[in-house]
Amino acid sequence: MANLGCWMLVLFVATWSDLGLCKKRPKPGGWNTGGSRYPGQGSPGGNRYPPQGGGGWGQPHGGGWGQPHGGGWGQPHGGGWGQPHGGGWGQGGGTHSQWNKPSKPKTNMKHMAGAAAAGAVVGGLGGYMLGSAMSRPIIHFGSDYEDRYYRENMHRYPNQVYYRPMDQYSSQNNFVHDCVNITIKQHTVTTTTKGENFTETDVKMMERVVEQMCITQYERESQAYYQRGSSMVLFSSPPVILLISFLIFLIVG
């Protein structure tokens, strides 16, 4: 880890040093230099933007003031104010006009709330969070009747589980046990309120289904917890702290 931080430090120092040298180089095209910054101006260094069809002042086909085919004020074919063929203010011919454009659609707050629901703390449940939706697992219960009953009624069972952060439990079994109990309780109360009741067979199958989903949720939380711990170790190492301090010094300076 220390070697990785040192190599990253060397790489960023070399990169920022090269950028610093580039910033100090003089830019061409300024005042009293060879390159011209404006079209139509003769200079020893050449013209970076050659005139299109005689673009100087007062030319018969240029874009100057009051010319027959130019884009100045009040010309019939120019791009000035209120002209019938121009791309000026409020005209139909201007493909890049910023006026009269439809406003951008606003973000639907319901969609934002739905996207933030997974993993969010559920109010009124004492710190429980609602996991993301899962596919209901394929489970065999040991008899053709129960297997068929499960396939026909699996849509009535939960596809999300309630859980607390894994660091509040001493083992996976405790996490899964609590997850199963709170999930079945909440789902049963919600469904019963809608007028639907569960039989003993339903409860038995829900316990198996929710148990598998809670195990999956525990594995996801374990992986995320490990990744967060690895990130904290990486950013707390002395080489990385030195690198971040050096980058802040370069940006501020």
Curated annotation (Swiss-Prot):
Tell me which species this is from.
Pan troglodytes
Q: How does it sit in the membrane?
A: Lipid-anchor; GPI-anchor
**Please, where does GPI-anchor amidated serine lipid attachment map on the chain?**
S230
Which positions bind Cu(2+) 3? H77, G78, G79
Q: What does this protein do?
A: Its primary physiological function is unclear. Has cytoprotective activity against internal or environmental stresses. May play a role in neuronal development and synaptic plasticity. May be required for neuronal myelin sheath maintenance. May play a role in iron uptake and iron homeostasis. Soluble oligomers are toxic to cultured neuroblastoma cells and induce apoptosis (in vitro). Association with GPC1 (via its heparan sulfate chains) targets PRNP to lipid rafts. Also provides Cu(2+) or Zn(2+) for the ascorbate-mediated GPC1 deaminase degradation of its heparan sulfate side chains.
* Alphabetical list of SMART domains matching this protein: PRP
| Name the record gives this protein | Major prion protein
Disulfide-bonded cysteines: C179-C214
Q: Where are the transmembrane segments?
A: none
- The main location is membrane
Query: What are the top taxonomic ranks of the organism?
Result: Eukaryota, Metazoa, Chordata, Craniata, Vertebrata
